[in-house]
């Protein structure tokens, strides 16, 4: 069964010095880097997802095209330099993107979802209608949001619909 690790929105604006710093980003970054390394060792495809705010909607609080904050964190790019990058403008990484085509091209049957923010882009991607054809898991230690409580609430909300596991359990 071909697996793919989806790394969603690990972008500079969510880290210290960014426009919308999240909770626990250092630990999540380290856990995600370990997951990427294990994925590479096990032949699991890696797909990076980058949110770019739609300029037609005016200036966004973060992820504005051309800003430093919109860039994927350099450690992620260094860890997965060959990974395709899917650009999105919505919380659901499948909506109006090439993600589904990329996963089909890779022969993907299972997706391991991680990233930022847990209650938004991570869960919206994991519960997307387009994700229904995949065995879907969220890597709980490779996700974060504005606070621990929001993170836990978001994971609890999708717990009956998919597997929640740590990256160590997944790999």
Identify the meaning behind each predicted range.
Residues 1-10:
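Short coil-to-beta-strand
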Residues 3-4, 31-42, 61-171:
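Active-site-adjacent betaalpha module
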Residues 14-18, 55-59:
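A short acidic, helix-capping loop that chelates divalent metal ions and anchors anionic groups
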Residues 15, 19, 24, 33-37:
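Active-site neighborhood of HAD-like aspartate-dependent phosphohydrolases
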Residues 19-25, 60-65:
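Short glycine-enriched, charge-decorated loop/helix-capping segments at active-site entrances
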Residues 39-56:
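PIN/NYN-family metal-dependent endoribonuclease catalytic core
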């Amino acid at each position: 069964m071909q697996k793919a690790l989806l790394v969603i929105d690990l972008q500079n604006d969510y880290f210290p010095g960014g426009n919308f710093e999240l909770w626990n980003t250092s630990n999540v970054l380290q856990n995600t880097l370990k997951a990427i390394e294990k994925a590479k060792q096990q032949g699991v495809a890696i797909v990076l997802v980058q949110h770019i705010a739609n300029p037609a909607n005016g200036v966004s609080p973060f992820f504005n095209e051309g800003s430093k904050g919109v860039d994927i964190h350099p450690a992620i790019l260094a860890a997965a330099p060959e990974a395709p990058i899917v650009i999105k403008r919505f919380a659901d990484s499948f909506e109006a993107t090439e993600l589904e085509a990329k996963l089909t091209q890779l022969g993907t049957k299972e997706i391991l979802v991680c990233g930022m923010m847990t209650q938004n882009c991570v869960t919206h991607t994991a519960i997307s209608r387009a994700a229904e054809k995949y065995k879907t898991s969220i890597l709980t230690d490779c996700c974060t949001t504005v606070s621990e409580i929001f993170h836990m609430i978001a994971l609890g909300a999708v717990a009956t619909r998919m597997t929640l596991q740590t990256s160590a359990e997944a790999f």
